[in-house]
């Protein structure tokens, strides 16, 4: 099976395809609401390239502080710039009011990422409207969203679930990051702001993982047509990023990429997988083979696996980074997904500076501290509805 990975052209007897042609694609990233806006602003500050950014919000004050001039005020008449008040129906009407402006913003895109925090008013209500408009324009549309912490209350959880169901009606694929999973990978000493900063970093890596695959030419190249073939109408999607150095770095990076504690389930059962392997000039063909074998072993035999590789001369630390996007779970007899961990996590530490963390630290859960998670039996029945969340942290 591994030998099939290195065919010079598409091998019709194998579901692993390598392409050499480059298709430039028009990619737009839309941050909807406060949470989505925070994520997009972080992407801009980090220098994510090759994409066009848009911010859409009902809160004019928050919108005016955005890092891009591409901004749309949602519901200028209905909300008068004061936000949606945690009411998704208000967010939905506000987006419908701005239908023409949203259409003009999305027009011409080949692919649109919609990032939002589910559970509040604007992101929850407006994101599905934006996705619907993108679908009507024939754009490949991917949602990258978060779900609220359990302690944010049942109402917010329920609103998030309803909003996510609506979003799924219109996107080709959606990557969901439950905020509760943060409790598995962050220490108790982290502040609320630091914790949400980690969520924004994960959203950044999710978008960057796909945009880099499309926009950065590789030795074994994956283009937009490849991505579209796997992502289009694929339903739920999972994404992981691994990064490792030293002996066995490719295998370790692959294990990290399929061992994501911040996502909702494993890649087992995926019908389509996109893989990008990036390393410095010293990356060897056997390392690519080893990493590919790890990923193949984690998915079904008949899954379509598209692998691209790129050599980045700026990588000077001897590391290899692997991005895995897995899709098509609903196509497998509607079977339910189980939260499963693959492999083992590498040891890592966190010094309190979020900017110095590697994306793989988030996705593999590679931290020394292992606090009790609400997903592991802690009391999740408390309904803290009286907690006020600052506007800039509302997802």
Where are these regions (language model features)?
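Tubulin/FtsZ superfamily GTPase core signature
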Residues: 1-395
